[in-house]
Amino acid sequence: SMNNFSLILRLTFGKTRILLPGDTNRAGYGGIPPEKLAADLFKVGHHGQLDGADAALVNAVRPRFSVCCASSDRRYNSAHPDTMRLLKDSGAELYFSDCPPVDGQSIPPHRALEFTICADGAASARYLP
């Protein structure tokens, strides 16, 4: 898939790591040692489609926060329920670029997500109205 030519970028600020895999699906991570994938904030690859993450990838990343950029109409199965459940079951807090109901919880209308990362490694996230 051409999506697997996406740049996989991991940023580190103090003790906080951010993994930005672009449109990569799980096959695109081949050859990257699992310890290089560990991240506190994970932008889910391939818009959270079913091939965007699997258990092995989620176990390697171990995210505290996961962000899924998906279309509100869920075209192409973005933010696939199985992928979101896998991330949620791992303990990650889920955030979305749109406002879908997730497990019965509504997400407030928003225009942006704000992640605050402190030098001591503390991090928080919130939607901006």
Please give the residue ranges for each predicted region:
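Binuclear metal-ion centers of metallo-dependent hydrolases, dominated by the metallo-beta-lactamase
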Residues: 1-3, 65, 72-129
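Active-site-proximal loop/helix segments of hydrolase catalytic cores
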Residues: 1-79
